[in-house]
């Protein structure tokens, strides 16, 4: 997990958005299912994740999940570019670096009801 992921989670909490952290090892199908279930409007991802000496193409996996269909709620994808490789951007994609360029130093909080969900956490269940 990157510092930008922590920033994104905290920013969501600050402005009253529900977030869901998805394990980087999930398949496109698993991501598609979670996006559809949560009716996600925004996806924040990175071009790659490095785990166990391997480079995992997160942005490509997200693009594949969206291409499967059914993720009609998604309006934008924000991508953190961690490598110097070209990143495949779709028309509605935004680079993290472009997004934060002109942001203010402070952001007023958005107040929500006490019952408003802070996050959605998906677990893998083992059936015995």
Predicted feature residues:
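Conserved pre-ATP/AMP-binding loop-to-beta segment of ANL
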Residues: 75-79, 88-122
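Flexible, active-site-proximal loop/turn residues at the rims of small-molecule/cofactor binding pockets
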Residues: 49, 83-84, 105
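Conserved AMP-binding/adenylate-forming
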Residues: 1-32
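Conserved small/polar residues in nucleotide/adenosyl-binding loops
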Residues: 123-128
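Conserved residues at the C-terminal ends of beta-strands
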Residues: 46, 80-81
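Short helix-terminating capping/connector loops at secondary-structure junctions
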Residues: 70-74
């Amino acid at each position: 997990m990157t510092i930008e992921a922590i920033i994104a989670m905290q920013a969501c909490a600050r402005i009253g958005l529900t977030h869901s952290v998805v394990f980087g090892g999930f398949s496109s199908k698993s991501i598609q299912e979670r996006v559809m279930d949560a009716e996600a409007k925004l996806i924040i991802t990175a071009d790659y994740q490095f785990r166990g000496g391997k480079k995992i193409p997160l942005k490509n996996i997200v693009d594949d999940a969206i291409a499967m269909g059914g993720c009609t709620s998604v309006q934008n994808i924000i991508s953190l570019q961690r490598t110097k490789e070209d990143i495949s951007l779709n028309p509605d994609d935004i680079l993290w670096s472009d997004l934060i360029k002109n942001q203010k130093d402070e952001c007023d909080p958005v107040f929500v009801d006490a019952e408003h969900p802070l996050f959605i956490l998906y677990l893998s269940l083992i059936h015995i």
